[in-house]
Amino acid sequence: MTWTVIFTVKAERDLAKLPDDIAKRIILKIETIAENDPYDQLDRMTNSPYYKFRVGVYRGIVNIVNDKMILQLVRARHRSQVCEPHLVKT
């Protein structure tokens, strides 16, 4: 089953600030994750309800809404910035 992918406003802003090729790779990656079981491809963040994935040195932060089969991209940033706790609040 395919999951639905949605983007938060902050994630859309993050993607707009990234180089075009990186933003496209992040979007392609989350769409690929949505086609399969996301739990096999995402890592849970420590002490957080969110999950993460890597695209080179960039990270995507994802919220999974199980009952509706939705993957919500919360943030997409360089790895040095994305794991700061205040950045993943929606």
Task: Show where each model-derived region lies.
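Enriched for short, Lys/Arg-rich terminal
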Residues: 2-4, 17, 21-24, 55, ...
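Hydrophobic recognition helices of helix-based DNA-binding modules
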Residues: 15-18, 33
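A short, surface-exposed loop/turn module that caps and links secondary-structure elements
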Residues: 29-54
